[in-house]
């Protein structure tokens, strides 16, 4: 008895579909970077396009490919999530002969050691994001992204408070910036993503450092009293809007990646969870290094 291949059946009302696939696949991944193995639990989404002449995509092939590539990554160590995403992307096009486009997205939580001002060591969580896209015959593009949390302090409220307090206590005006002024503050969540050609490497740790260094202050999982005071003082000596965070990151990207091509895409997204409002503050820039360089030259 001949088995019917329902997916390959022709249909009359056919329209091409941009992405068809599976989402939310969780797999263990070992990334070898900086001389050490990083054990991550990755969430993976994979897609291919579907021509108008085909009823369905062969979903089981996607699971098979992911399983094969994860197994191979244990034996042949991968350097990054985006490298693994790219390898999966290529294999998707090999197995889905009807597809002209493939896309893989991956995310994982990642921990780095940090030190508080007193020297206490802590392991702090960050989020890694990777994406790879390939068009048959047109090569591969990959994206590396990070998400970090920290603290911002509002500069507008700070100046207003300083003005009002100086009216009541004139001596404060003489101190100027020597004493940090009170303000409302926020937990900030910022994402930085860069899309580069297949052969270009961008280090995730560098992106995390850029994001953390652009906030009013990093935050930590554990803080004793002195460290807690230092975090608060540091943030209020370095007040920032979400707009400031995004612009500071863009400036650091230009300095750090002078040799990358103008075509490299950059996305910076920052959101602060307001403490005195019921809404959040948000800022974003989606651009290329070329556009940023043109803006800098003006």
Q: Where do the language-model regions lie?
A:
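N-terminal intrinsically disordered, cationic/polar leader segments
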Residues: 1-298
């Amino acid at each position: 008895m001949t088995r019917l291949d329902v997916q390959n059946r022709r249909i009359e009302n056919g329209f091409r579909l941009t992405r068809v696939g599976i989402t939310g696949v969780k797999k263990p991944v070992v990334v070898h970077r900086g001389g050490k193995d990083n054990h991550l639990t990755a969430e993976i989404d994979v897609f291919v396009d579907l021509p108008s002449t085909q009823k369905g995509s062969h979903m089981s092939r996607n699971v098979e490919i992911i399983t094969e590539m994860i197994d191979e990554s244990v034996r042949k160590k991968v350097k990054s999530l985006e490298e693994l995403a790219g390898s999966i992307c290529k294999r998707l096009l090999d197995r889905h002969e009807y597809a002209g486009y493939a896309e893989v997205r991956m995310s994982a939580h990642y921990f780095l050691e940090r030190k508080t001002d007193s020297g206490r060591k802590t392991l702090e969580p960050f989020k890694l994001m990777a994406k790879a896209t390939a068009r048959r015959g047109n090569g591969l593009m990959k994206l590396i992204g990070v998400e970090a949390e920290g603290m911002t302090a509002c500069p507008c409220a700070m100046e207003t408070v300083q003005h009002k307090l100086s009216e009541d206590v004139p001596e404060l005006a003489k101190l100027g910036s020597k004493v940090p002024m009170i303000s409302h503050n926020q937990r900030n969540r910022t994402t930085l993503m860069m899309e580069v050609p297949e052969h270009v490497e961008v280090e995730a740790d560098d992106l995390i450092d850029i994001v953390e260094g652009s906030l009013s202050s990093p935050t930590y999982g554990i803080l004793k009293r002195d460290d807690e005071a230092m975090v608060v003082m540091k943030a209020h000596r370095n007040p920032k809007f979400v707009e400031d965070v995004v612009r500071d990151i863009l400036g650091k990207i230009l300095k750090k990646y002078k040799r990358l091509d103008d075509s490299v895409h950059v996305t910076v997204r920052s959101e602060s969870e307001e403490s005195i409002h019921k809404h959040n503050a948000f800022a974003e820039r989606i651009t290329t290094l070329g556009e940023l360089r043109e803006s800098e030259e003006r």
